[in-house]
């Protein structure tokens, strides 16, 4: 019964925030903070008490540590079916942590419609947790689409317009909504197609994941359905060339919106590929793998090159996310269990480091009222702590040894090298580009001639505790990643069985 509460707490908390807005300005903030802290504590309690070593038998049904199933729409075979394994637990814990931080980082930034802001913020987080727990495909799609509307409001109502005034927050919100909504509808068609193919074979309408895993598909149908899922996940990840919504959404979103977008929403796409696209369509995924990995390579270099050209610090960090998710794409489609576990570490590490960079960008914006790096400069001597902390997270995002990002990228590269050595050699050069754009960001923002002699406020205890906490977690993940690797091993072994068998069959032809 604990799984529904992980989803219900943010929804109930968000509604209470909206009601509390009329009585107090600070009460909605405390309700939101309490709600996400409760989600984080529950997920850590499950981690401490659950057994996550259950690996599925080859060709058998998936194994879950926790399950909750209630029939919802019997005629259509739709259930409220929630399940948790090691992968989904890690993602829910990450959501809880970044949810707490997104509430804290918007504490002073948001000053109007505070209750409605926290309603949207918590409903996004509730929808994300729903995506990570839903196993019924209709329920998964329901939560997938449900995240979009509150995210639209978050950007449209509380976002910032660009410094040149050309791109407004409404433009960014609408572009985000159209891209993700259109791709989601493609996935809906693919889900319905899979359900009808199963219905024609068995005479039973069902959206149950375990049942649909056994559906026999012809090669052409499997390819079409796999592409339907891939398009939706590729847009959300995002994969070049369907990435253009991301920099605009990040640049115009409030800090909490950017933290959620980079830290969690992009991970729902990688999770969707691992949980649904690969196991449901293993043969088509195996044939598609070289294309997907080359798309990952393009993303690594394209994201890095566009990062060089940015003057807006938030757009630079956004394009760096495109580059980092290219490594995730390569790891997912390599079919190597080592690389798949590297993907999990990289998802968590990128969630922590990208969230920290966007929090730091927000702290800069609150003080300087600009995101244009040409108007910064010389901040190293004028601001205590913030420049040094920014340097740490910029170094972490380029894969500094001793941080989680290094472990994730190293596992992806070493695991996939056995399978696709040429692609990995090329991808390694992407790390060189990452070091260049990270150092460009630090140099432009913090060094060089000072643009003003006015004193700048340093970080207060709330701001300092957020980024230092993330730094400690990132170093812990880099120095001792074993708990994360242990808890995700069984889940990744199951995925590797599905895709690995298909890749072996393909190689034997």
Swiss-Prot record:
Transmembrane segments: 1-21, 30-50, 87-107, 123-143, 176-196, 223-243, 261-281, 288-308, 316-336, 342-362, 376-396, 422-442, 467-487
Signal peptide bounds: none
Enzymatic reactions: a quinone + NADH + 5 H(+)(in) = a quinol + NAD(+) + 4 H(+)(out)
Keyword Membrane found: yes
InterPro entries on file: NADH_Q_OxRdtase_chainM/4, NADH_UbQ_OxRdtase, ND/Mrp_TM
GO CC annotations, alphabetized: plasma membrane; respiratory chain complex I
Enzyme class: translocase
Keywords assigned by UniProt, alphabetized: Cell inner membrane, Cell membrane, Membrane, NAD, Quinone, Translocase, Transmembrane, Transmembrane helix, Ubiquinone
Topological relation to the membrane, as annotated: Multi-pass membrane protein
Entry's EC annotation: 7.1.1.-
Superkingdom of source: Bacteria
Protein's cellular compartments: Cell inner membrane
GO molecular function: NADH dehydrogenase (ubiquinone) activity; ubiquinone binding
GO BP annotation list: aerobic respiration; ATP synthesis coupled electron transport; electron transport coupled proton transport
Pfam annotation, one family: Proton_antipo_M
Purpose of the protein: NDH-1 shuttles electrons from NADH, via FMN and iron-sulfur (Fe-S) centers, to quinones in the respiratory chain. The immediate electron acceptor for the enzyme in this species is believed to be ubiquinone. Couples the redox reaction to proton translocation (for every two electrons transferred, four hydrogen ions are translocated across the cytoplasmic membrane), and thus conserves the redox energy in a proton gradient.
NCBIfam families hit by this protein: NDH_I_M, PRK05846.1-1
Family membership noted in the UniProt record: Belongs to the complex I subunit 4 family.
Subunit composition and interactions: Composed of 13 different subunits. Subunits NuoA, H, J, K, L, M, N constitute the membrane sector of the complex.
Name listed for the protein in its UniProt record: NADH-quinone oxidoreductase subunit M
The organism of origin for this protein: Pseudomonas aeruginosa (strain ATCC 15692 / DSM 22644 / CIP 104116 / JCM 14847 / LMG 12228 / 1C / PRS 101 / PAO1)
Organismal lineage: Bacteria, Pseudomonadati, Pseudomonadota, Gammaproteobacteria, Pseudomonadales
Gene transcribed to yield this protein: nuoM
């Amino acid at each position: 019964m604990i799984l529904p509460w992980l989803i219900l707490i943010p929804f109930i908390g968000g509604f209470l925030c909206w009601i509390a807005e009329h009585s107090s300005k600070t009460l909605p903030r405390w309700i939101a903070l309490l709600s996400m802290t409760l989600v984080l504590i529950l997920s850590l309690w499950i981690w401490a008490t659950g057994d996550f070593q259950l690996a599925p038998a080859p060709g058998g049904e998936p194994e879950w540590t926790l399950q909750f199933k209630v029939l919802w729409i019997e005629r259509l075979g739709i259930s409220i079916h929630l399940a948790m394994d090691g992968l989904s637990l890690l993602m829910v814990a990450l959501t809880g942590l970044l949810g707490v931080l997104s509430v804290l980082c918007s504490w002073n930034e948001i000053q109007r419609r505070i209750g409605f802001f926290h309603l949207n913020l918590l409903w996004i987080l509730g929808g994300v947790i729903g995506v990570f727990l839903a196993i019924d495909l209709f329920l998964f799609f329901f939560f997938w689409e449900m995240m979009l509307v509150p995210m639209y409001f978050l950007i449209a109502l509380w976002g910032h317009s660009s410094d040149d005034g050309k791109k407004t927050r409404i433009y960014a919100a609408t572009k985000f909504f159209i891209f993700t909504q259109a791709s989601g509808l493609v996935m809906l068609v693919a889900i319905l197609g899979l359900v009808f193919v199963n219905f024609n074979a068995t005479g039973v309408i069902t959206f149950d994941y375990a049942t649909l895993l056994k559906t026999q598909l012809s090669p052409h149908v499997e390819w079409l359905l796999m592409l339907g899922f891939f398009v939706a996940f590729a847009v959300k990840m995002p994969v070049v060339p369907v990435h253009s919504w991301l920099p605009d959404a990040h640049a115009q979103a409030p800090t909490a919106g950017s933290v959620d977008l980079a830290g969690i929403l992009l991970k729902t796409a990688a999770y969707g590929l691992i949980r649904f696209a690969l196991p449901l369509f293993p043969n088509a995924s195996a044939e598609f793998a070289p294309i997907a990995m080359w798309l990952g390579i393009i993303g690594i270099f394209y994201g890095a090159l566009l990062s060089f050209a940015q003057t807006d610090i938030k757009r630079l960090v956004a394009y760096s996310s495109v580059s980092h998710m290219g490594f995730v794409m390569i790891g997912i489609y390599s079919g190597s269990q080592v690389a798949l576990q590297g993907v999990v570490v990289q998802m968590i590490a990128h969630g922590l480091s990208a969230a920290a960079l966007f929090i730091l960008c927000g702290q800069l914006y609150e003080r300087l009222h600009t995101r244009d790096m040409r108007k910064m400069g010389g901040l190293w001597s004028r601001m205590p702590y913030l420049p040094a902390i920014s340097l740490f997270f910029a170094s972490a995002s380029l894969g500094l040894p001793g941080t989680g990002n290094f472990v994730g990228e190293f596992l992806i590269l070493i695991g996939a090298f056995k399978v696709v050595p040429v692609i990995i050699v090329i991808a390694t050069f992407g790390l060189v580009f990452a070091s260049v754009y990270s150092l460009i960001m630090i140099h432009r923002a913090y060094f060089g001639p000072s643009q003003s002699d006015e004193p700048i406020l340093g970080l207060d205890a709330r701001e300092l505790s957020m980024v230092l906490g993330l730094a400690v977690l990132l170093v812990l993940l880099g120095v001792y990643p074993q708990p994360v690797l242990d808890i995700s091993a069984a889940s990744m072994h199951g995925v590797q069985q599905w895709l690995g068998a298909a890749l072996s069959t393909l190689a034997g032809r």
